[in-house]
Swiss-Prot record:
Gene name linked to the record: cas9-2
Bias (Basic and acidic residues) ranges: 1100-1109
Biased composition range(s): Polar residues: 1116-1129
Function according to Swiss-Prot or TrEMBL: CRISPR (clustered regularly interspaced short palindromic repeat) is an adaptive immune system that provides protection against mobile genetic elements (viruses, transposable elements and conjugative plasmids). CRISPR clusters contain spacers, sequences complementary to antecedent mobile elements, and target invading nucleic acids. CRISPR clusters are transcribed and processed into CRISPR RNA (crRNA). In type II CRISPR systems correct processing of pre-crRNA requires a trans-encoded small RNA (tracrRNA), endogenous ribonuclease 3 (rnc) and this protein.
Matches recorded under InterPro entries: Cas9, Cas9-BH, Cas9_PI, Cas9_REC, Cas9_RuvC, HNH_CAS9, HNH_nuc, RNaseH_sf
Details of cofactor binding: Endonuclease activity on target dsDNA requires Mg(2+).
Record comment regarding domains: Has 2 endonuclease domains. The discontinuous RuvC-like domain cleaves the target DNA noncomplementary to crRNA while the HNH nuclease domain cleaves the target DNA complementary to crRNA.
UniProt-listed GO biological process terms: defense response to virus; maintenance of CRISPR repeat elements
Residue ranges, annotated region (PAM-interacting domain (PI)): 1102-1388
Residue ranges of domain HNH Cas9-type in the record: 771-928
Enzyme class: hydrolase
Protein name listed in UniProt: CRISPR-associated endonuclease Cas9 2
Length: 1388
């Protein structure tokens, strides 16, 4: 039997570190068998390693391509339906017509008939184009003419309408004469007033319509409309909406008090994403006003289209397009004449050079209208007499094309209007048109409802439609074949996600009245107030909360702090009220209540709890469906409750978004003792006033236990762990890490002879710790300072600049001391004394909440002071004496937004008794105990995998402890014992973290077994009394000293030093827990192992990479046909289209590589030659290869194939000199070219690791020790440099770069310490690795070393892997290996 052991895991988004430890903290090693054809049969390996992999990605790219394919397929089908109707009649006139149209884009040699697509002869073709320069000329002619037209022309006009049929946003009847701008503007105003609680109105809306239709610039339109509303400012939010509506860009940053720019532009392709981002900051409540503004913008745009002088025409759109064509023609002639007079050179650049943004590039589609206007404006501004052109450019009405972005505002009804005119006129001459009129119209108007979804049959992952009968679906039989009601139900089930806490329950809509009520009470429950004669802040009681909801939340959409103050004063007579837990206004609201009240107009009905189910069902329907017909159908069941007018108004309402919680969680599950639901507690929780998170984690209530029980995996799911992980909340990246970690644990158990581990310790990386928003915020420091100091009335930013700086910018403000200096207006935060800006390094940065309790290094927890001792006690917040003196100043900083409410609260906490023992215990405990839901899910998966037996009470019998640990504990352990981590050196740090997790967790639980309820997943009733037994003060002492068991001595704040025993023991059992010499020596020894199992996960590629972003089978954009004799390899746009004639797609993405042993014919004499070589298999070719591998390779020119070995991306090769390479890809179009990565890991001794740790942090001005250490050990850089150079010589092979580096290093003594550090390890705060770019695993990269540019090493070739190379297949841990000596292949 194997000895007892534990497993440590460090799970990230692109790595999993792992380690096996024994009871004495050692990492065992095992002699592992090696399979394959090499002489190596066994290798001794340490049970310590890391699995690296490419991060999981979202399905967005795949989804976008899939929807585009469907759109094009359906468009093609519409054309085929029309051809089917025309086919019999057309055959009697011209039986090759459709064939010629299909061949129209083919080169002349490939056409099956005449090269003239419409009439088949030059004379008629020319006459057609002379009479009808654009398709719109033809459409207008046919719509207005009473003459019999050629059937081919009728088809062309109808096909154009069916192909580009317009949007379906407007329901019901619509024509060009009822495009009501005034009504749309009133709708926008109503919504704006409701959301922003204003009362804007416009008496003369006709005036507004005249302004938007006038031929003036967009800016002038906005200004004129704004003047119709005298109370509105040019800088206000209404003005920004007007900018949007007239077609300009708006910025809502100031309006919503955001840190970053929030630009929106209706005509931008990214508008939907930009709006989604903005709503993410400000809330979905505002989505309606943007929706109404967009509708108004579309109406204005459409009115601009349809402004024609010919009132008799039945083709208003075509008339507008003809007008645009004529204006373009006339303006082009004027522009050509004008520019010709400037110079011939300018004329040629504008009209002949398509590489510029001039007319040649614009008309050829290589530059867009916006860039063309910018180019032209700049050119024309230099010359006189260009006012006509410049005015039209300002109106965006110059040289417009027929097809532009604003065509998207045309509804399908406009095309239908013209279609009906043509059919009515021509049906007199072609009876089949009269007979099929409804069918033809149906082709244009038919749209598959989104709730029916894709119509695929069989095992499609993306289709859910339910059929009544099994036959081909057409626009005319859709209603008979598809069961719309059942499909809608399937859509609901598919659309609604599951509760994070109760995985079997569906979440509520975001606008559910229950969900909104929950959010309101959850926010209210943490509001506190203080008034005159009150000693401390107190929470609102149950009656007060109910009153506020009834009187304010149900009376207005946005409730503010003033409302609460007004209530407390009016009802309770309080004066001098101050609030906490709310900034100006509540985030939550009962917006749905107000919507329904406006529609139903029955407050009693809404307030009656017995109607809750009806209201929730209505909101659910309005969230799920957009289709008015389906909404009406589903609301029809309430006809006996509401009258028709109410149901009609309801059917027009639409909600978006889903909450995160279910009705059952909020108001379903009940506490076993009290019988209360979570909502009940939020409304009335006595004096506790716990919020949602506190309620579900409170051991005194049964919610926590019920949630845990609900999360247990069913037996039917346990077999398919991949599906279970897939269903977890979280990103694809973190899920991939979880899945790999479970595979690693399975393999380690196998390696350990099948014996289960004593414990598994899990630490999980936080995702996106450095988000774009975070980066942006750090870069916005200057802007925020300028704004806040201006508010304070301070000129310090301009007047006080450090002597060593010429100006203050965002870079300079990354220095926390300088930033704090300005945030504090140059004052000591505790004394108010002036600080000297040129002596900032002499001052202390003090942590408001001491680091002993909270490791918070954010600006919110830091102040700059002349001496930290001025705060008062070192184990508490600043003293009451300091608060009394400085509170007024701090309040000024708060009002100017130089400090946050949280910072102010912590600074003034002494007024409320300072840090209580409960506060301190809570701070410390939160840093020790992992609370993230995703980590709990992983712990649950492992717990149910290994502890699946039950006792007689149906409780899990836990033989394997699943321990979750926060990274702060290991970070503290590393810091205390100088076990430095430097990520740039190699990938070992993931394995080391996993090992240290296991060590720290094991030692702590041996010493303090009563900590199991804190760290071990599951139910531990025997220790539950531990929490109640210890007082808060005892907890503080216990938690803050928890890591002291590893230290020999502890230094106290008062200067005393307490010695601890050399060997820590468990006080109850006497068992030895931690020997501070031998056990620490063991840890140092393990971290110094040069042999760590590093595996890069090999994977078949399902997508390529395009500038670092996932792409499809090849580059998305078509490339033009290659020049004659070009070697460029393209994939045809269609299988039957030769890319040499028609162009195609470049950048073919590879899936994997095969190693082929066989023969090929070489040279002109076709000499048979034996080969062993790589052949890339593209994602495109993969299906054909899998169908018949041998035949596929024979077609590639191979003969007598003896052997095929498939090699996924990152397959590992070891050369005879010990250097390792990973095969990233071989081009499928040229097997002599490919990408080979470095595969060795450099190992450094601890003295070099320590040097580099300090070197990476040399710019840290708070801790000068980093610089001092590097200055004292500068000589070690020389030794390190030559060690790295030797590694390069032996394993990397970049010998030319080695010489370049050697030459650059000769002058190293002349370089500053900062240059040396950034050259060796990369600049502080950067992801660049400096000199370690040369040695690190993966693709080569260029870098700079001591001022010399070192180019990317590109000399690895595919053939280099075939000389004396051994192919190494590794298992997920790297412990199992199969080695194949390529030289011995074929020896049987």
């Amino acid at each position: 039997m194997t000895k007892p052991y534990s497993i440590g895991l460090d799970i990230g988004t692109n790595s999993v570190g792992w380690a096996v430890t024994t009871d004495n903290y050692k990492v065992p090693s095992k002699k592992m068998k090696v399979l394959g054809n090499t002489s190596k049969k066994y290798i001794k390996k340490n049970l310590l390693g890391v699995l690296l992999f490419d991060s999981g990605i979202t399905a967005e790219g795949r989804r976008l391509k899939r929807t585009a394919r469907r759109r094009y397929t359906r468009r093609r089908n519409r054309i085929l339906y029309l051809q089917e109707i025309f086919s019999t009649e057309m055959a009697t006139l011209d039986d090759a017509f459709f064939q010629r149209l299909d061949d129209s884009f083919l080169v002349p040699d490939d056409k099956r008939d005449s090269k003239y697509p419409i009439f088949g002869n030059l004379v008629e073709e020319k006459a057609y184009h002379d009479e009808f320069p654009t398709i719109y000329h033809l459409r207008k002619y046919l719509a207005d003419s009473t003459k019999k037209a050629d059937l081919r022309l009728v088809y062309l006009a109808l096909a154009h309408m069916i192909k580009y049929r317009g949007h379906f946003l407007i329901e019901g009847e619509f024509n060009s004469k009822n495009n009501d701008i005034q009504k749309n503007f009133q709708d926008f105003l109503d919504t704006y007033n409701a959301i922003f609680e204003s009362d804007l109105s416009l008496e003369n809306s006709k005036q507004l319509e005249e302004i938007v239709k006038d031929k003036i610039s967009k800016l002038e339109k906005k200004d004129r409309i704004l003047k119709l509303f005298p109370g509105e400012k040019n800088s206000g939010i209404f003005s920004e909406f007007l900018k949007l509506i007239v077609g300009n860009q708006a910025d809502f940053r100031k309006c919503f008090n955001l840190d970053e720019k929030a630009s929106l532009h209706f005509s931008k392709e990214s508008y939907d994403e930009d709006l989604e981002t903005l709503l993410g900051y400000i809330g979905d409540d505002y989505s309606d006003v943007f929706l109404k503004a967009k509708k108004l913008y579309d109406a204005i745009l459409l009115s601009g289209f349809l402004t024609v002088t010919d009132n008799e025409t039945e083709a208003p759109l075509s008339s507008a397009m003809i007008k645009r064509y004529n204006e373009h023609k006339e303006d082009l002639a004027l522009l050509k004449e004008y520019i010709r007079n400037i110079s011939l050179k300018t004329y040629n650049e504008v009209f002949k050079d398509d590489t510029k943004n001039g007319y040649a590039g614009y008309i050829d589609g290589k530059t867009n209208q916006e860039d063309f206007y910018v180019y032209l404006k700049k050119l024309l501004a230099e010359f006189e007499g260009a006012d006509y052109f410049l005015e039209k450019i300002d109106r965006e009405d110059f040289l417009r094309k027929q097809r532009t972005f604003d065509n998207g505002s045309i509804p399908y009804q406009i095309h239908l209007q013209e279609m009906r005119a043509i059919l009515d006129k021509q049906a007199k001459f072609y009876p089949f048109l009269a007979k099929n009129k409804e069918r033809i119209e149906k082709i244009l108007t038919f749209r598959i409802p989104y709730y029916v979804g894709p119509l695929a049959r069989g095992n499609s992952d993306f289709a859910w439609s339910i059929r009544k009968r099994n036959e081909k679906i057409t626009p005319w039989n859709f209603e008979d074949v598809i069961d719309k009601e059942s499909s809608a139900e399937a859509f609901i089930n598919r659309m609604t996600s599951f509760d994070l806490y109760l995985p079997e329950e569906k979440v509520l809509p975001k606008h559910s009245l229950l969900y909104e009520t929950f959010n309101v009470y959850n926010e209210l429950t943490k509001v506190r107030f203080i008034a005159e004669s009150m000693r401390d802040y107190q929470f609102l009681d149950s009656k007060q909360k109910k009153d506020i909801v009834r009187l304010y939340f149900k009376d207005k959409r946005k409730v503010t702090d003033k409302d609460i103050i007004e209530y407390l004063h009016a009802i309770y007579g309080y004066d001098g009220i101050e609030l906490k837990g709310i900034e100006k206004q509540f985030n939550s609201s009962l917006s749905t209540y107000h919507d329904l009240l406006n529609i139903i107009n029955d407050k009693e009905f809404l307030d009656d709890s017995s109607n809750e189910a009806i209201i929730e069902e209505i909101i659910h329907t309005l969230t799920i469906f957009e289709d008015r017909e389906m909404i009406k159908q589903r609301l029809s069941k309430f006809e006996n409750i509401f009258d028709k007018s109410v149901l009609k108004k309801l059917s027009r309402r639409h909600y978006t978004g889903w909450g995160k919680l279910s009705a059952k969680l909020i108001n379903g599950i009940r506490d076993e003792k009290s019988g209360n639901t979570i909502l009940d507690y939020l409304i009335d929780d006595g004096i506790s006033n716990r919020n949602f998170m506190q309620l579900i984690h409170d051991d005194a209530l049964s919610f926590k236990k019920k949630i845990q029980k609900a999360q247990i995996i069913g037996d039917e799911d346990k077999g398919n762990i991949k599906e279970v992980v897939k269903s977890l909340p979280g990103s694809p990246a973190i899920k991939k890490g979880i899945l790999q970690s479970i595979k690693i644990v399975d393999e380690l158990v196998k390696v350990m002879g099948g014996r289960k581990p004593e414990s598994i310790v899990v630490e999980m990386a936080r995702e996106n710790q450095y988000t774009n928003q975070g980066k942006s915020n750090s870069q916005q420091r200057l802007k925020r300072l300028e704004k806040s100091l201006k508010e304070l009335g301070s000129k310090i930013l301009k007047e006080n600049i450090p002597a060593k700086l010429s100006k203050i910018d965002n870079n300079a403000l990354q220095n926390d001391r300088l930033y704090l200096y300005y945030l504090q207006n140059g004052k000591d935060m505790y004394t108010g004394d002036d600080l000297d800006i040129d002596r900032l390094s002499n001052y202390d940065i003090d942590h408001i909440i001491p680091q002993a309790f909270l490791k918070d290094n954010s600006i919110d927890n830091k102040v700059l002071v002349s001496s930290a001792s001025n705060r008062g006690k070192s184990d508490d917040v600043p003293s009451l004496e300091v608060v009394k003196k400085r509170k007024t100043f701090w309040y000024q900083l708060l009002k100017s937004k130089l400090i946050s409410q949280r910072k102010f609260d912590n600074l003034t906490k002494a007024e409320r008794g300072g840090l209580s023992p409960e506060d301190k215990a809570g701070f410390i405990q939160r840093q020790l105990v992992e609370t993230r839901q995703i980590t709990k899910h992983v712990a649950r998966l492992l717990d149910e995998k290994f502890n699946n037996k039950k006792d007689e009470n149906n409780r899990a019998v836990r033989t394997v402890k699943i321990i979750t640990l926060k990274s702060t504990l290991v970070s503290q352990f590393r810091k205390d014992f100088e076990l430095y981590k430097v990520r740039e050196i190699n990938d070992f740090h993931h394995a080391h973290d996993a090992y240290l997790n296991a060590v720290v967790a094991s030692a702590l639980l041996k010493k303090y077994p009563k900590l199991e309820p804190e760290f071990v997943y599951g139910d531990y009733p025997k220790y539950n009394s531990f929490r109640e037994r210890k007082s808060a003060t005892e907890k503080v002492y216990f938690y803050s000293n928890i890591m002291n068991i590893f230290k020999k001595s502890i230094s106290l704040a008062d200067g005393r030093v307490i010695e601890r025993p050399l060997i820590e023991v468990n006080e109850e059992t006497g068992e030895s827990v931690w020997n501070k010499e031998s056990d620490l020596a063991t840890v140092r020894r393990v971290l110094s192992y040069p042999q760590v199992n590093v595996v890069k996960k090999v994977e078949e590629q399902n997508h390529g990479l395009d500038r670092g972003k996932p792409k499809g089978l090849f580059n998305a954009n078509l490339s033009s046909k290659p020049k004659p004799n070009s070697n460029e390899n393209l994939v045809g746009a269609k299988e039957y289209l030769d890319p040499k004639k028609y162009g195609g797609y470049a950048g073919i993405s590879n899936s994997f590589t095969v190693l082929v042993k066989g023969t090929i014919e070489k040279g002109a004499k076709k000499k048979i030659t034996n080969v062993l070589e790589f052949q890339g298999i593209s994602i495109l070719d993969r299906i054909n290869y899998r169908k018949d591998k041998l035949n596929f390779l024979l077609e590639k020119g191979y003969k007598d194939i003896e052997l095929i070995i498939e090699l996924p991306k990152y397959s590992l090769f070891e050369l005879s000199d010990g250097s390792r390479r990973m095969l990233a890809s071989i081009l499928s179009t040229n097997n002599k070219r490919g990408e080979i990565h470095k595969g060795n890991q450099i190992f450094l001794s601890q003295k070099f690791v320590k040097l580099l740790y300090h070197a990476k942090r040399i710019s840290n001005t708070i801790n000068e020790n980093h610089r001092k250490y590097v200055e004292n050990h500068k000589k070690e850089f020389e030794e390190l440099f030559y060690y790295i150079l030797e590694f390069n010589e032996n394993y990397v092979g970049a010998k030319k770069n080695g010489k370049l580096l050697n030459s650059a290093f000769q002058s190293w003594q002349n370089h500053s310490i900062d240059e040396l550090c950034s050259s060796f390890i990369g600049p502080t705060g950067s992801e660049r690795k400096g000199l370690f770019e040369l040695t690190s695993r993966g693709s080569a990269a260029d870098f700079e070393f001591l001022g010399v540019k070192i180019p990317r090493y590109r000399d690895y070739t595919p053939s280099s892997l075939l000389k004396d190379a051994t192919l190494i297949h590794q298992s997920v841990t790297g412990l199992y290996e199969t080695r194949i000596d390529l030289a011995k292949l074929g020896e049987g």
